[in-house]
């Protein structure tokens, strides 16, 4: 399988990489959170831009991105606007969503963007091409905070992301039962063994799905999300506990 290298981090080799999400509503909080996060043990910094209040001011958004880049220059920076329909804090038009991601790509400050699969096929394809032309990687994502579809549908979505040339397909689903967690893990394994030619990220959310955040190396998920302070999604555990478990499983 092809790995993805961002800065010096090789995603898709070794233990799953730890992603943490920074959620701050203004530049002052971005700065203070960044200083706190700098001391934590993680691999990729995700900036959840949908928590940022001054979204209409692109200069303000990029000033915040610059603070993150300068505070943690060695960490890959993932720029994520999570739409309201997929569990985010704000709703914006598709046009504004694409423009925001293009501005991030143009800035030269971010290493990766998160691009939601169901934004619209043409817009997704164009944005992937634009990102790649500027040496920015794309995590293509889908989130369902209500349910877990059948394994075939999970695999179909991941394969669609791969067909759109996402560098890393990602899916996060809400289990209604423990068997839903098994469905997600089985789909992950089948995708990884039969179809994936690049790293994928999968997770089952909430307390029921916590096990899926720990066993990625076994079933084929290349990264997992941990919490430095506040969790960005239900079921995340602290980065220190997460690193301990991932290391134990990797060395076993």
UniProtKB/Swiss-Prot annotation:
Function: Involved in the third step of the chorismate pathway, which leads to the biosynthesis of aromatic amino acids. Catalyzes the cis-dehydration of 3-dehydroquinate (DHQ) and introduces the first double bond of the aromatic ring to yield 3-dehydroshikimate.
One GO BP: aromatic amino acid family biosynthetic process
Domain of life: Bacteria
Assigned keywords, A-Z: Amino-acid biosynthesis, Aromatic amino acid biosynthesis, Lyase, Schiff base
Quaternary context: Homodimer.
Lyase keyword on record: yes
Protein name in UniProt: 3-dehydroquinate dehydratase
GO terms assigned for molecular function: 3-dehydroquinate dehydratase activity
Pathway(s) where this gene product acts: Metabolic intermediate biosynthesis; chorismate biosynthesis; chorismate from D-erythrose 4-phosphate and phosphoenolpyruvate: step 3/7
NCBIfam families xrefs: aroD (TIGR01093)
InterPro entries linked to this entry: 3-dehydroquinate_DH_AS, Aldolase_TIM, DHquinase_I, Type-I_3-dehydroquinase
Entry annotation: catalytic residues: 143 (proton donor/acceptor), 170 (schiff-base intermediate with substrate)
Record-annotated membrane-spanning stretches: none
HAMAP family: AroD
Top EC class of this enzyme: lyase
Source organism of the structure: Shigella flexneri
Family in the record: Belongs to the type-I 3-dehydroquinase family.
EC nos: 4.2.1.10
Cross-referenced Pfam families: DHquinase_I
